[in-house]
């Protein structure tokens, strides 16, 4: 069964109005970030001016200010530029302690971003193609298994979305307490999200969430405590990033609270790590998609290509159903110009803490669960965009001043930067 929300109107400002109002940076937004140029971004954003002559002490203070403004990656670049090594061996004050707590996460995020920006089809990457589905929602899924255990899964999912989906998508990700209302559940085999509780709001766009998932018999339920960090790297690279990392019992959250022990007998805590990346659709994406569609049409695979194996009939039917569900959305079309689109990518690693994973369960997760959950996420974001999710509408309204007004302003700056030079297309 899948949770459905009541229909209500949600007023989201027109993206182009936000873009035009921001009048953001008149620069090209490439993927490569010059450390010196990135260092100057705080001045444009209202922070203290940067200087090549800044002392290490001043660099640390400025880095903390950047962290407080959700610009962790810029803080890490600033510290590297001024030769401040983190972790700091002998922290002297609260500034040092904060840098030690936050900055190491930047390296993890940078590695994930580098992986997400690399072509998964490059020889030697070990990615296997699960599906490259072309339709109203373009979805590409890749995966690889740990060679030693064959139980640890790394998956990568990519979809281009229209620019007016950016704020709704981010809001659905942020509203973790509503996950249980829309994430799909299965009875055969049993797989469902039973609990999604926010333990702490640790920052403007950072939180700690407890998620419990029931697995098929004879496996016990699994859960993880997820520390999610939203990072604004718009002024430096044009990107928005989210890092999700599991926490262990007894660890301290950034708010000072302690991660609790498992509160149910038989439930097993697992390891999970993920990174979301929102960036301009790379050049050539459309051509590759069209080529995949042409190949799929030639071989009669109805718009889906990849390593589909036996038993995929039900999955293909489900994919078709998910794809068709969205066609009732008035005023929104399947085709978009590359100048309208943002590429959303996520890479996730999970260790289920199992000595053996049956092939049937593994195939179910790889072939069905990942695709269905991703399409449901896109579908709910579409509902939010169209004002059709009362629960999300209520949360967005309640958090406008503290969060969503800022999200709209920053995403407006991102879109203006990415589509500068008169390439912003009216929605």
For every predicted segment, state its role.
Residues 3-427:
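Eukaryotic helix-grip
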């Amino acid at each position: 069964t899948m949770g459905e929300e009541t229909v209500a109107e949600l007023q989201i400002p027109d993206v182009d109005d936000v873009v035009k109002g921001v009048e953001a940076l008149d620069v090209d937004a490439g993927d490569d970030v010059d450390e010196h140029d990135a260092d100057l971004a705080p001045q444009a954003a209202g922070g203290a001016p940067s200087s090549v002559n800044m002392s290490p002490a001043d660099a640390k203070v400025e880095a903390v200010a950047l962290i407080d403004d959700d610009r962790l990656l810029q803080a890490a670049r600033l510290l590297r530029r001024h030769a401040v090594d983190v972790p700091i061996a002998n922290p002297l004050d609260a500034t040092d302690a904060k840098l030690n707590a936050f900055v190491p996460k930047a390296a993890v995020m940078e590695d994930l971003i580098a992986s997400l920006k690399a072509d998964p089809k490059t020889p030697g990457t070990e990615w296997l193609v699960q599906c490259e589905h072309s339709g109203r929602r373009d979805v590409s899924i890749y995966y690889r298994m740990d060679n030693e255990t064959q139980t640890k899964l790394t998956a990568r999912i990519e979809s281009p979305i229209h620019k007016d989906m950016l704020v709704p998508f981010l809001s659905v990700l942020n509203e973790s307490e509503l996950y249980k209302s829309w994430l799909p559940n299965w009875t055969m085999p049993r797989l469902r999200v039973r609990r999604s509780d926010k333990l702490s709001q640790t920052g403007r766009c950072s939180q700690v969430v407890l998620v419990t998932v029931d697995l098929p018999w004879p496996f016990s339920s699994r859960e993880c405590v997820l520390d999610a960090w939203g990072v604004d790297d718009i002024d430096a690279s044009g990107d928005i990033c989210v890092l999700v990392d599991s926490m262990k019992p007894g660890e301290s959250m950034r708010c000072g609270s302690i991660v609790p022990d498992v509160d149910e007998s038989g439930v097993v805590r697992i390891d999970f790590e993920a990174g979301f990346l929102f960036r301009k659709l790379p050049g050539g994406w459309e051509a590759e998609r069209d080529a995949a569609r042409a190949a799929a049409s030639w071989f009669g695979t109805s718009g889906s290509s990849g390593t589909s194996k036996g038993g995929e009939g039900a999955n293909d039917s489900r994919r078709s159903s998910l794809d068709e569900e969205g066609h009732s959305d008035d005023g929104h079309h399947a085709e978009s110009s590359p100048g309208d689109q943002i590429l959303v990518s996520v890479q996730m690693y999970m260790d289920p803490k199992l000595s053996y994973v049956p092939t049937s369960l593994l195939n179910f997760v790889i072939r069905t669960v990942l695709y269905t959950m991703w399409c449901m996420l896109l579908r709910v974001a579409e509902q939010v965009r169209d004002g059709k999710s009362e629960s999300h509408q209520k949360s967005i309204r309640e958090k406008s001043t503290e969060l969503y007004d800022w999200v709209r302003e920053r995403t407006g700056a991102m879109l203006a930067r990415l589509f500068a030079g008169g390439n912003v297309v009216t929605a």
